[in-house]
């Protein structure tokens, strides 16, 4: 009996002991458990990946939507600014027109007042000159009658001028 034979017998006995103590089943159970755990981890990783892709797609959709909303807000703000500028320009033009019209009215009123004042002064001067001439040429009784008559005429003329 050789050493090889005894080594073979030792190996067979060792394997028989392993089978007797159910070591192969324990190893298989352990490997099955480990394989199941790895499979579960892979399934979880796939689920998480799909969830991450869904979240990414949702984020990208929301980002695109937010970008679109921002563009709409900017466009609306630009339209509003243009409307405000246009309205301000129109109001400024109206203000300038009104101020010019008011200035023209004031100038026309000042011209009319100046003409009335000059006319009134000319009338007063003419009446005074006529009074002086009449007083020199007429007696006092006749002069008073003519002055009264001319004053009445002058008053009527002034009233017509002021009323017109």
Curated annotation (Swiss-Prot):
Q: Which UniProt keywords apply?
A: ATP synthesis, Cell inner membrane, Cell membrane, CF(0), Hydrogen ion transport, Ion transport, Membrane, Transmembrane, Transmembrane helix, Transport
Task: Answer whether the UniProt record assigns the keyword rRNA-binding to this protein.
Answer: no
The intrachain disulfides are none
GO annotations of cellular component type: plasma membrane; proton-transporting ATP synthase complex
| Subcellular location(s) per record | Cell inner membrane
Q: Which Pfam families match?
A: ATP-synt_B (PF00430)
Which Gene Ontology terms cover its molecular function? proton-transporting ATP synthase activity, rotational mechanism; proton-transporting ATPase activity, rotational mechanism
InterPro entries cross-referenced by the UniProt entry: ATP_synth_b/b'su_bac/chlpt (IPR002146), ATP_synthase_B_chain (IPR050059)
Residue ranges annotated as transmembrane are 4-24
Give the highest taxon in the source lineage: Bacteria
- Where is the major localization of this protein? membrane
Q: How does it sit in the membrane?
A: Single-pass membrane protein
Family per similarity comment: Belongs to the ATPase B chain family.
Q: Which HAMAP family match?
A: ATP_synth_b_bprime (MF_01398)
- Subunit-level organization: F-type ATPases have 2 components, F(1) - the catalytic core - and F(0) - the membrane proton channel. F(1) has five subunits: alpha(3), beta(3), gamma(1), delta(1), epsilon(1). F(0) has three main subunits: a(1), b(2) and c(10-14). The alpha and beta chains form an alternating ring which encloses part of the gamma chain. F(1) is attached to F(0) by a central stalk formed by the gamma and epsilon chains, while a peripheral stalk is formed by the delta and b chains.
Q: What does this protein do?
A: F(1)F(0) ATP synthase produces ATP from ADP in the presence of a proton or sodium gradient. F-type ATPases consist of two structural domains, F(1) containing the extramembraneous catalytic core and F(0) containing the membrane proton channel, linked together by a central stalk and a peripheral stalk. During catalysis, ATP synthesis in the catalytic domain of F(1) is coupled via a rotary mechanism of the central stalk subunits to proton translocation.
Q: What is this protein called?
A: ATP synthase subunit b 2
From which source organism is this entry?
Bartonella henselae (strain ATCC 49882 / DSM 28221 / CCUG 30454 / Houston 1)
């Amino acid at each position: 009996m050789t050493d090889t034979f005894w080594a073979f017998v030792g190996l067979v006995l060792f394997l028989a002991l392993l089978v007797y103590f159910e070591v192969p089943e324990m190893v298989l159970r352990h490997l099955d458990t480990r394989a199941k755990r790895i499979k579960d981890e892979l399934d979880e990783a796939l689920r998480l990946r799909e969830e991450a892709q869904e979240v990414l797609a949702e984020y990208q959709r929301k980002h695109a939507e937010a970008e679109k909303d921002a563009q709409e807000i900017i466009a609306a703000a630009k339209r509003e600014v243009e409307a405000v500028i246009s309205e301000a320009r129109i109001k400024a033009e109206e203000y300038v027109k009104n101020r010019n019209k008011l200035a023209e009215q004031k100038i026309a009123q000042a011209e009319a007042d100046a003409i009335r004042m000059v006319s009134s002064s000319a009338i007063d001067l003419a009446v005074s000159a006529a009074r002086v001439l009449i007083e020199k040429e007429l007696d006092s009784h006749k002069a008073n009658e003519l002055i009264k008559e001319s004053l009445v005429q002058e008053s009527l003329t002034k009233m017509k001028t002021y009323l017109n």
